[in-house]
């Protein structure tokens, strides 16, 4: 009986923690060197936009019109939006969108403008290469080069187009109808007719220096 009591006391006095032998430690996969480290989270996708980064193209809403259509059941209202987009590096576009809501019409106009991008020449990274006058329907526009630092002399409608195209120094003057849509189309028509010195020299079989000395 005394031996049994002594054995029970020894069991009670033992440390409750279980001691691991060398074999159990070796078999434990967590203690082996072959266990791979925990993988980090996947990096962000390349096409994911950074919140702090600026978009390549900027957009401006030129006009929003409400359209009313009379049907048997009454009147149906919709909206028509016009927008200009550009990267300020010689790329600019003008688009039109229709929808039942203003926001949807603006989105469609911006998307349409992005699909209609055109390239325009920028002389010395600030102005147009030469003077030009263009007429579109009842609207007329005159565009002249300006010295560096002069800024943009233009109406709000024309300013939206030339700024997004990338011009920083330019003179403009509009005549006739001041309808915003016609003015924008006249401005784009004028910009598309601009020619660089190299283009003029190639057309006239002259050197760039000779073409620059002559009036374009």
Swiss-Prot record:
A GO cellular-component term linked to this record: small ribosomal subunit
Biased composition (Polar residues): 20-31
Entry keyword set: Ribonucleoprotein, Ribosomal protein, RNA-binding, rRNA-binding
Pfam family, one: Ribosomal_S5_C
Entry's Gene Ontology BP terms: translation
Keyword hit for Chloroplast: no
Annotated GO MF terms: rRNA binding; structural constituent of ribosome
Annotated SUPFAM superfamilies: dsRNA-binding domain-like, Ribosomal protein S5 domain 2-like
InterPro entries hit by this protein: Ribosomal_Su5_D2-typ_SF, Ribosomal_uS5, Ribosomal_uS5_bac-type, Ribosomal_uS5_C, Ribosomal_uS5_N, Ribosomal_uS5_N_CS, Ribsml_uS5_D2-typ_fold_subgr
Spans annotated as Disordered: 1-55
Gene3D superfamilies: 3.30.160.20, 3.30.230.10
Keyword RNA-binding: yes
Domain named S5 DRBM: residues: 57-120
Alphabetical list of PANTHER family matching this protein: MITOCHONDRIAL RIBOSOMAL PROTEIN S5
Record note on quaternary structure: Part of the 30S ribosomal subunit. Contacts proteins S4 and S8.
Record function comment: With S4 and S12 plays an important role in translational accuracy.
Family the UniProt entry places it in: Belongs to the universal ribosomal protein uS5 family.
Name this protein carries in UniProt: Small ribosomal subunit protein uS5
Protein species of origin: Mesomycoplasma hyopneumoniae (strain 7448)
Gene behind the chain: rpsE
């Amino acid at each position: 009986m005394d031996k049994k009591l002594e054995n029970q006391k020894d069991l009670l006095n033992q440390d409750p923690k279980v001691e691991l032998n060398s074999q159990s430690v070796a078999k434990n996969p967590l203690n082996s060197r072959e266990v791979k480290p925990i993988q980090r989270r996947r990096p962000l996708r390349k096409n994911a936009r950074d919140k702090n980064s600026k978009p390549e193209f900027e957009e401006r809403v030129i006009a929003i019109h409400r359209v009313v259509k009379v049907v048997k059941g009454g009147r149906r209202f919709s909206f028509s939006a016009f927008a200009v987009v550009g990267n300020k590096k010689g790329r600019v576009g003008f688009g039109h969108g229709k929808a039942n809501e203003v926001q949807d019409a603006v989105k469609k106009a911006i998307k349409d403008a992005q699909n209609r991008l055109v390239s325009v020449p920028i002389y010395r990274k600030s102005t147009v290469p030469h003077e030009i006058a263009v007429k579109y329907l009842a609207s007329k526009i005159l565009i002249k080069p300006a010295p560096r630092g002069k800024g943009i002399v233009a109406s709000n409608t024309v300013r939206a187009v030339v700024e997004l195209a990338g011009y920083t120094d330019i003179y403009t003057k509009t005549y006739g109808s001041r309808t915003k849509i016609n003015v924008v189309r006249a401005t784009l028509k004028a910009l598309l007719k601009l020619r660089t010195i190299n283009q003029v020299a190639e057309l006239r079989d002259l050197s760039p220096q000779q073409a620059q000395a002559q009036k374009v």
